[in-house]
Amino acid sequence: MFAAGLAPFYASNFSLWSAAYCSSAGPGGCSFPLDPAAVKKPSFCIADILHAGVGDLGAAPEGLAGASAAALTAHLGSVHPHASFQAAARSPLRPTPVVAPSEVPAGFPQRLSPLSAAYHHHHPQQQQQQQQPQQQQPPPPPRAGALQPPASGTRVVPNPHHSGSAPAPSSKDLKFGIDRILSAEFDPKVKEGNTLRDLTSLLTGGRPAGVHLSGLQPSAGQFFASLDPINEASAILSPLNSNPRNSVQHQFQDTFPGPYAVLTKDTMPQTYKRKRSWSRAVFSNLQRKGLEKRFEIQKYVTKPDRKQLAAMLGLTDAQVKVWFQNRRMKWRHSKEAQAQKDKDKEAGEKPSGGAPAADGEQDERSPSRSEGEAESESSDSESLDMAPSDTERTEGSERSLHQTTVIKAPVTGALITASSAGSGGSSGGGGNSFSFSSASSLSSSSTSAGCASSLGGGGASELLPATQPTASSAPKSPEPAQGALGCL
């Protein structure tokens, strides 16, 4: 909105009007001649706009020419009689607010500012001269869709009668307009429908000369011709439908063999399984045996040997290389498994092997133990209340007899002589029993008999303690000594 307080500032500091119109010698005369002191090159710097006339014009109190400001105010008052325009008595930085006119003069369009309205108001004769030739020579009717530029030197006046004859091109008419891009023509589904429609038109319409479709099935053209356009429209307009065109394409895929088969992503078989870039080599028995024999001889083959082996077995160098790598890995695993198995076996044999050795030691110790039983003073049988068996008694008696006859022969002879000497004073039964006891083992009964005979003769009683340690095979105990003492 135009503010009247800035009008003197703009009029005096900017050359909005040329000197031909703003000077007194201009055409038609100008009621507000431009101050010659204020005429300078226009500047659009913000500092020059705000402080345009502060230091340049010292005569004027606010940096504005008083005559030019008063003339412009009077001019604006004559143009707009309903509005009150006052001279800018204050600084142009804080102009006096003025109410804008409520009614715009009917002779000027709404988009023209009051300054341009004043310009047009002071030159009505020039406007009338320009409008008269236009009325005398009406322009030829423009063609539909053709845009005619306005003639030079004429002012374009909006005419409501000619506005509808040459409309602006819409976005639909443009090839790459927004409406065309967003339209259904760019939809891929619609494009497929158009392709089917073109095929149908080619089959049902005229065929070019020299083209014979005898190889095709006769029902192909009828099938495409019988496609209902309603189904196509429903397929386009109903996106929630489950692709009805799939069934149509599957139906005519077999109908049109060769180049007419429609190959799209819907008709192509969906194979999501990833195909391996390499295939597993299958070796024959002969090849496997040859590789195994070579592996037994040589675990690592050199490149020349590998090529020679591959040529002999009918394999490639890469196949032989991979086979040897896998075979070496298998061989290492088998060796590690065998070593672990042997280690576990050895660990299991150690505890079980110690038991037989202990049993053997016990068996070795048992004979010496049995031999020492005859000479040692052990009371195991008495403490455990166990009597020796008959076999032990017989063995002990034989060994004691052998020892007495070999080692203690003079003692036994002494015993015999002593017993014979002592038997003279005693009864015959007592002597016989004593001699029997000296030849056999000394048991409890023999000792008692010996004691009875010794009571008769004192010579034999002195030799009895000497014969007991050597002749008895039973373990020694304090009982025989006590019995002998009792007898004494």
From Swiss-Prot:
Skewed-composition ranges (Basic and acidic residues): 334-349, 363-372, 390-401
GO cellular component annotations of the record: chromatin; nucleus
InterPro entries reported for this sequence: H2.0_Homeobox_TF, HD, HD_metazoa, Homeobox_CS, Homeodomain-like_sf, HTH_motif
Compositionally biased residues, Gly residues: 422-432
Localization (cell): Nucleus
Low complexity bias locations: 125-135, 158-171, 433-454
Coiled-coil intervals, chain numbering: none
Protein's UniProt keywords contain Transcription regulation: yes
Record-linked SMART domains: HOX
Renumbered residue ranges of the record's region Disordered: 118-173, 331-488
Biased composition (Acidic residues): 373-383
Tissue specificity comment: Low level in normal B and T-cells, high level in activated lymphocytes and monocytes. Also found in thymus, tonsil, bone marrow, developing vessels, and fetal brain.
Keyword DNA-binding tagged: yes
GO biological process terms on file: embryonic digestive tract morphogenesis; enteric nervous system development; epithelial cell proliferation; liver development; negative regulation of T-helper 2 cell differentiation; organ growth; positive regulation of epithelial cell proliferation; positive regulation of organ growth
Domain of life: Eukaryota
DNA-binding region: 276-335
GO molecular function list: DNA-binding transcription factor activity, RNA polymerase II-specific; sequence-specific DNA binding
Keywords annotated in UniProt: Differentiation, DNA-binding, Homeobox, Nucleus, Transcription, Transcription regulation
Similarity annotation: Belongs to the H2.0 homeobox family.
Its job: Transcription factor required for TBX21/T-bet-dependent maturation of Th1 cells as well as maintenance of Th1-specific gene expression. Involved in embryogenesis and hematopoiesis.
PANTHER family: H2.0-LIKE HOMEOBOX PROTEIN (PTHR46808:SF1)
Stated name of the protein: H2.0-like homeobox protein
The organism of origin for this protein: Homo sapiens
Gene: HLX
